[in-house]
């Protein structure tokens, strides 16, 4: 499954995540996202000693939630303006346990088996190659590591901003792609976070898995 398989036809580019408009987008991402970050961290079972990878971290709200729970965190995002904002907002307290790195899901700047938890929140619909991104996530997760993907639940046929997410069918396709990428126990479900209904995909790397 590539971005072309999404109902809106193509991956959403990152052009708007630049300059002043990028800062504005980053600020918008911080509004009302606390419940989403807490939900994903809870679904992933994040706790002290975990090494968390946040793919498409934006300004780092979910990364800071993981750090508050005692994890060390690597936030990866292709937009330099998001990384700068994330570093600024994470400069004190537990935020000092977060490292922000420029990169994309399809070529993660992370070593093999380096993390115990990986998640992608509202970012998979931006990926240019979903199977490649999932293979990369499998590569960087340690055996037994947990994966959570969370996207807004979209309606079939939605257009514009309403299509920024996954339909139930696309969530099922993403779970199947995760299984094909080597993950075990891949499945999809819906959750509520504040006013949002989310399509969530969860899986794990088998404790004795190859690769």
PLM feature segments, named:
Residues 106-117:
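A short acidic, Gly/Pro-enriched loop at the edge of an enzyme's catalytic core
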Residues 202-211:
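C-terminal lobe and adjacent flexible extensions of AdoMet/dcAdoMet transferase-like proteins
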Residues 117-130:
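A short SAM/SAH-binding and catalytic strip from SAM-dependent methyltransferases
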Residues 51-107:
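Class I SAM-dependent methyltransferase SAM/SAH-binding core
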Residues 30-50:
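Conserved alpha-helix/loop element of class I SAM-dependent methyltransferases that forms part
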Residues 4-33, 146-202:
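C-terminal alpha-helical "lid/dimerization" subdomain adjacent to the S-adenosyl-L-methionine
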Residues 131-143:
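A short glycine-rich, Lys/Arg-flanked "PGG" loop and its adjoining helix->strand segment in the class I
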Residues 51, 145-146:
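Short glycine-centered segments of the SAM/dcSAM-binding site in methyltransferase folds
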């Amino acid at each position: 499954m590539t971005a072309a398989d999404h109902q809106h036809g193509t991956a959403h580019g990152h052009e708007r995540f630049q300059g002043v408009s990028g800062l504005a987008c980053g600020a918008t991402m911080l509004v009302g996202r606390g419940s989403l970050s807490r939900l994903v961290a809870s679904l992933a079972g994040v706790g002290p000693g975990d090494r968390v990878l946040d793919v498409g971290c934006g300004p780092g709200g979910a990364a800071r939630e993981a750090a508050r729970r005692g994890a060390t965190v690597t936030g990866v995002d292709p937009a330099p303006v998001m990384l700068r904002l994330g570093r600024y907002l994470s400069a004190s307290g537990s935020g000092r346990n977060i490292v922000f790195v420029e990169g994309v899901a399809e070529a993660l700047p992370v070593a093999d088996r380096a993390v115990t938890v990986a998640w992608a929140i509202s970012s998979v619909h931006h990926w240019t190659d979903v199977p490649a991104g999932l293979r990369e996530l499998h590569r960087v997760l340690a055996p037994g590591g947990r994966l959570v993907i969370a996207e807004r639940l979209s309606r079939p046929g939605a257009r514009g901003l309403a299509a920024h997410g996954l339909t139930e069918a696309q969530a099922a396709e993403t779970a199947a792609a995760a299984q094909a990428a080597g993950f075990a126990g891949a499945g999809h479900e819906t959750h509520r976070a504040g006013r949002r209904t989310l399509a969530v995909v969860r899986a794990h790397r088998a404790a004795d898995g190859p690769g």
